[in-house]
Design a protein with these regions (language model features):
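Single conserved hydrophobic/aromatic residue that forms the stacking wall/gate
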Residues: 1-8
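Accessory interaction regions appended to the cores of large information-processing enzymes
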Residues: 195-200
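Short glycine-/aliphatic-rich beta-strand segments at the starts of folded cytosolic domains
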Residues: 207-216
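Non-catalytic interaction/clamp surfaces of large macromolecular machines
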Residues: 77-192
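Regular secondary-structure segments
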Residues: 19-33, 62-69, 73, 95, ...
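Conserved phosphate/anionic-ligand binding catalytic regions in large, soluble enzymes, centered on
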Residues: 9-10, 14-20, 48-66, 148-174
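Short, hydrophobic/aliphatic alpha-helical segments
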Residues: 3, 33-50, 136-157
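Transmembrane helical cores of multi-pass ion-transport proteins
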Residues: 27-48, 64, 71-91
């Protein structure tokens, strides 16, 4: 499911920096043979996303992947407690990668989902319900980003980094459900003056990112 979600997600993310990050991870995952294990898969996702990371949104996404995969690399089954810990580790890693975290960005959306996962962890054993509720919370927080960042409210858009993250999570969930993925890649130019989702690129300076390479 992880393998499919990476390839599927790259098809629908409009943020080019995040797309390049996802594509880099997907290429490394695709290069793995069929007879691979969780540790190798996690290493490919982490290193591939980090190598392909572009811009703040891409770097932060790679750090979310890094924390998430580091948490699950020794696991054989991804159940609710494992996923909850992975969400927490992903958010912790991403926040540590930014010197001056700003709310209303991809970081806020990720933290909202992590917090919701923690709330649900002891209340349900239904993985489908768990995933749906976590994604629902991510969408809710994403819709609030214009209220957190004046630049987004002025433009009348949500944060594009957070929006891209939601596409990644939804792609992973659809792969988990066994839904067919549309492999068609289309590139369309937005009409002049059409509103794009804002990005944390406008509110997080490049100098805010502590590192763009693996420190391990």
């Amino acid at each position: 499911e992880i393998r499919l979600s990476l390839v599927g997600s790259e098809m629908c993310i409009r943020d080019s920096n995040m797309t390049m990050t996802i594509m880099s991870a997907a290429r490394e995952v695709s290069a793995l043979g069929d007879d691979t294990d969780m540790a190798a898969l996690c290493k490919a996702i982490s290193s591939g996303s980090l190598r392909g990371a572009r811009g703040n949104s891409g770097v932060i996404l790679s750090q979310l992947f890094r924390g998430f995969t580091k948490s699950i690399k020794e696991e054989q089954v991804l159940d609710i407690p494992v996923l909850t810990r992975a969400f927490e580790k992903a958010v912790e890693t991403a926040y540590k990668a930014v010197m001056k975290p700003k709310e209303g960005t991809i970081l806020t959306v990720a933290k909202g989902m992590s917090d919701r996962a923690l709330e649900l962890c002891d209340d349900t054993e239904d993985l489908v319900y768990f995933c749906e509720e976590v994604i629902k919370e991510g969408d809710r927080v994403l819709d609030l980003t214009p209220e957190m960042l004046p630049v987004l409210k002025q433009a009348g858009v949500v944060d594009s980094g957070g929006q891209g993250l939601m596409q990644v999570l939804k792609g992973a969930y659809e792969a988990f459900l066994g839904k067919e993925i549309d492999w068609t890649v289309t590139e369309t130019a937005a009409p002049a003056g059409a509103p794009f989702a804002g990005s944390q690129e406008t509110v997080l300076e490049e100098s805010d990112i502590k590192f763009g390479y693996c420190t391990e």
